[in-house]
Amino acid sequence: MSYQQQQCKQPCQPPPVCPPKKCPEPCPPPQCPEPCPPPKCPEPCPESCPPPSYQQKCPPVQPPPPCQQKCPPKSK
């Protein structure tokens, strides 16, 4: 058998991993704690706020005062 033929042989595949034959035991049912107490009712909602009163009017926007500064005469 030449060296090349030896190289060409595929190595054996490992046997597949068989699952264990014994069935796993089912989990025991969870131990229920004491039943939950009934949910506490929240306090009743406070009365809603009255709508804001729109009687106060905003002061009118004042335009900026006109510029009082005078430019110095240009010197020639």
Curated annotation (Swiss-Prot):
It comes from the Eukaryota. Keywords: Cytoplasm, Keratinization, Repeat. GO terms for cellular component: cornified envelope; cytoplasm. Residues 40-53 have a biased composition (Pro residues). Not expressed in uterus. Sequence repeats lie at residues 21-29, 30-38, 39-47. Belongs to the cornifin (SPRR) family. Cross-linked envelope protein of keratinocytes. It is a keratinocyte protein that first appears in the cell cytosol, but ultimately becomes cross-linked to membrane proteins by transglutaminase. All that results in the formation of an insoluble envelope beneath the plasma membrane. This is Small proline-rich protein 2I. The lineage of its organism: Eukaryota, Metazoa, Chordata, Craniata, Vertebrata.
